[in-house]
Amino acid sequence: MGGAAAIFRDGHGLNEPPLLRVNLKDDVIRDDSKASQLNSLDKGGGAGLLHTDSAEKNGTGAASGSPSEIDSFALSPLSQPADKDPSVGTPFMRQWAAAKRENPNALLFFRMGDFYELFYDDAAVASRELQLTLTARDKERNVPMCGVPYHAVEQYLTRLLRRGFRIALCDQMEDPKLTKKLVRREVTRVLTPGTALDAGLGQDENNFLAALFELGESHASHKDKSAARVGHSETVCAVALLDVSTGEFRTAEFRGGNARAQAVDELLMAAPSEVLQAASAEWPSDLQAQLERIPARSRVEDWVWTREFAVPLVERQLNVRSLEGFGLAGHEAAAIAAGAVLHYVRTTQKNEALHIDSLKFEQHSAALELDQVTVRNLELVEPLFAGQDDRVTLFRTLDACLTPMGKRLLRATILRPLNDAAKIEARYEAVAEAHGDLLKREEIRRAFGGILDLERLLARISLDSAGPRDVRAMAASLARLPGLKTAVDAMTAGLWREIAARLDVLDDVTARIARTLVAEPPLTLADGGVIAPGIDAELDELRTISTSGRQAIAAIEDRERQRTGIGSLKVRYNSVFGYYIEITKANLALAPADYERKQTLVNAERFTTPELKEYERKILSAHDRSIEIEKRIFGELRKFVLESASRIRRSSAAVAEADLLACFAHLAAGRRYTRPKLADEPVLEAVAARHPVIEQWMEETREGRFIANDVYLNAGDEGPSLLLVTGPNMGGKSTYLRQAAMLVLMAQMGSFVPAESLRLGLVDRIYTRIGASDNVARGRSTFMVEMTETATILNTATRRSLILLDEMGRGTATFDGLSLAWATVEYLHAETGARTLFATHYHELTMLEEKLKKVRNLRVGVKEAAGGIVFLHNIEVGAASKSYGIEVARLAGLPAAVIERAKHVLRQHERQERTAAADAQPGLAADPVQLTIFTPLSQRIVDRIEATDVNALTPLQALNLLEELQQELKEKG
C-alpha cells in the first residue's frame, strides 16, 4: 500500500527513514511525501508521523464504533475489490489514489470545483459522521462518494476534528479554466485535533497539541537505546504543549522515581486535543490507560525524538543559536519534546508557523502545584460530572474578562497560581488601584470592547488560513489599542506601568492594513475586490477596463439592435460560451452575414462577432489578471503583518494581563472581596470566609445567603495544623474544606478573596482526597483510588502544603477504615506537619485532640427540633455528639418503617459497642501494628457490667467486683 521508501538528508547529515508510517494496530504501513515540501520546512526532515488506531475495523476497512473509540483515524483507500481499484480507473481517480497513498490515515477532502469530495471508505465515514447523502461517482464501478461545498467546509471539518478524526485537504493548484488537462492538485494541509484553527474553538480555552517523552526511550542518533541513557541514571520525562491557534508554547521536565506519573499528570491537566509519543515508547499500562482520555494519540518516528534533530529545529524556529536563554540549559528532554511538537506542526501544516516565536520552560517551584485530582475535585475549570452546569466551576464564577486572551489567561492562572510573594503583591497593588477608582477601572474595561482574538487571528495569518476579513478584523482590533494604552497610562501601580510599557499600539500595522484593504472585503480573494483603489496602478487600470468593457458590451447591444432592426436582440454571457448575441427564431432572417453561429436553441440562435470576441478577451483577462495582482498584494500584506508577529504577540499578552487585573478589581468591587495579607509563617487565617462559587450561585438563583465561617490553621509553633471536622452529611463539611482551598487559590492568583480578612503563608501545593467517581468508572475500586491518592499525599506533601481529606476510609470495613484514618492523622501531625482539614464520619477520631497537640475538633452546627434537625451551616468549636445519619436519611425521603427500624438497630449497636477510649498512643510504633479500638476483652467487661444487678449488690460485693475487673484488665490488657 505504501509507496517506495524515500531517504532524505537534513542539514545535519542525519539519514532519515521514510516519511510517513501508519501503525494500524500492530501492522506498520509506510508511505512517502515530497522532498521539495519538506526541504523548505525542516531542511529535508521527513514527516516521521505514525498513528495508532485502536478501533475495530468492519469488513470494508472502515473504522467501526464511535470516533471516541478511535485513537487516530486510519483507512486504506485500496481496500476495495480489484475490479474497483482506483489505480486502474480514470486519470482523475488515479490522481485521487496517489493523494490518498500520501495520507492513508486521514479523511481525504478532494477539491472538485465548488465542492470537496470524498470517495470510497472516506465517503462512507463522512456520510455517517456528517449525515451526508452517499452517492456513486461511477454507476458501473460503484465508487461511493459524498461532498460538501468548499465555502462551508470549515463547519464540517470542525465536527470531524472534535471527534478525533484526521483530515487531509487536497486543493486545486491551478485554475480549471486555464487548462485543458487534468487540474493539478496537491495536499496543502493536514488537519488534526491538535492543530485545529477553526472558528469553533472555545475562546476561553486553549487547543493544545502535546508531546510526552522519556529521555532514552527513542533511538538516539539511530543507535541502541542504552546509549541514549548514558549519563542519565535517573528517570527524566518531559511534556511540551503547543497551541497552534494562539502560538502559546511551553515545556516542562520531571526527574526522579515519580517522573512518569508527574508528566502524565501535567499532560492531563492541560487537557490537550492530541498527544504525540515516540514510536517505541512503552509506558506503564496504568499511565498509558490514563492517556486514553485524550481524544487523539499519535506516534512519531523515533529519529524525531533525538537531540541531533529536535534541538536545532527549535533553535531555527526561535531564531537563536542556543536555548539557554529560554531556561533550557541542562534540560535536554524538554527541548526534544518541544522539537517533536514543532516538527509535527510544520509537517502537517506544510508551513513554518512563524507566529510560534517563543518558548517557556516552566519551573514547578514558580507556581502553586495542583494535580489533576485536585483540579477535578475542586471543579476549578470543569464540572465534576458531564452535563452539569459549568457555573459550578471557579473559572465561570470569576470570569468577568472581556477579551478571549484575558479569558485564557484567567483559566491558566487558576491552574497555575503564583508562588512568588513579590509577584503576588504586585498584582494586589494593581488590583487595589483599579478597585479604588471606579472611573479609571471602567475606562480600562470599556477599552477592551472591539478587541477580537489577536492571537488566533495572527495564527491564521501565519498559517495562510486567513481570508481578507480576518486581516481586516486584525486591523479593527489593533485600532482599539491606543485607547487602551491611554486608559492604562492613567494608572500608577507598578504592574500597570509595566503593561503600558509592553503595550505596542502597532499603528503602522493598522494603517498598512486599512490602506491596503477595502473597508468591507469579500469572504475570499477569489471573489475579487479585496484591495483598495490607489494601491496598484495596474490593478486600477484593469478594473477600469473591466468596468468600461461591460459598458462597451451594453453599447454593442444598442448598436446591433439599431443595425439589424431586431428590438429583442440581446448580448449576454455565460461561463461555457462567453459573450454571445441571441436572436429569436422569428428574427433569424434579419441576422447579418458577418454573425458567426455559436449555438442553436429551441427558440433562438446564438452568434458572436470578431468585435465581441475581442471585448470578451479584454474583460476576462482583465478580471483574471486583477485576481492575480490582488493575491500578490495580499501576500505582501500578510508578510508585512508576520514581520510584526512578535510585537502583536507581546501586545496581546499585555491586553490579556490588563484584562485579568481589571477583572479581579471588578469582582472585588461587586462582591465585597478583600485584599489578603501574606505572612512568612505557614498560616491560613480567614475571618468570615465564603465559598466564592456557592455564594455566587445562591445569589443568582436567589436561594438565600451564604453562611460565612472562620478558618485558622498554623503549621508553625502556634495554633492547630490539623482540623478534624465532624457532623452530619449535608451539614457543610465538604463545602468548608473546599472553601479553604478556594481562598488559597484566589489569593495566590493575585485576586482579592471572599472574606472579611485573610492572612496566608504561601502554599506550595494543594492536595485533595475527596471523590473517586472518574477512576471507579475506569475499573478501580473506590478504596484503591482513595488509598493511592492518600499515599501520594503522605509521600510528597511538605510543611507548606494544604491538604483536604474528606471522609477517608469509607470504602472499606468500618474498623479498617477507622484504623487507617487514625494512623493517617497521626502521621500528618507528627511527620508532615502540613495545614490539613480532615472531615470524617468516624467520631472516635475526635479523641485525638486530647492526644495530639496540634489537632483541633470542629463540628458543623445542627439544631434539633421536634420535626427533626435543621442544618445551620456554621462551623463550631468541638466534636459532634452524633452523626445524625438517620435524620439525613429521613430528610432524603426514606420510608418511615425503614427509619424506625434503623433507629432500633442503632440503639442495639450503641449498647453492644460502647467502649472505653482506644489504647493507641499518638507516637509512631517502631513496627507496624494493627490499631484496635474495640477488643474482645473490653466487650466482655462491658457485657459483665450490663448483666450485673447493681441494686442487689452490697457495698462490699461491689468493691470486690470492681477489683476483679481491674485485675482482669491488668493481666490481659
Language model segments and positions:
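ATPase nucleotide-binding head domains, primarily ABC-like/P-loop NTPase cores
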Residues: 120-123, 222, 234, 331, ...
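Active-site phosphate-binding and catalytic loops of NTP-dependent enzymes
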Residues: 170, 193-201, 352, 492-495, ...
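Extended, charged coiled-coil "arm/hinge" scaffolds of SMC/Rad50-like chromosome-maintenance ATPases
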Residues: 601, 605-639
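Extended, charged helical/alpha-beta scaffold domains that provide interaction surfaces
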Residues: 107-110, 114, 554, 561-585
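Charged, surface-exposed helical/loop "interaction arms" that form contiguous linear patches used
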Residues: 467, 480, 533-534, 558-568, ...
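C-terminal low-complexity, glycine/proline- and small-hydrophobic-enriched intrinsically disordered tails
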Residues: 929-940, 948
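Charged catalytic and DNA/RNA-contacting regions of genome-maintenance
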Residues: 2-61, 65-433, 446-462, 466-558, ...
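Terminal-proximal interaction/regulatory segments of ATP-powered molecular machines
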Residues: 574, 933, 949-973
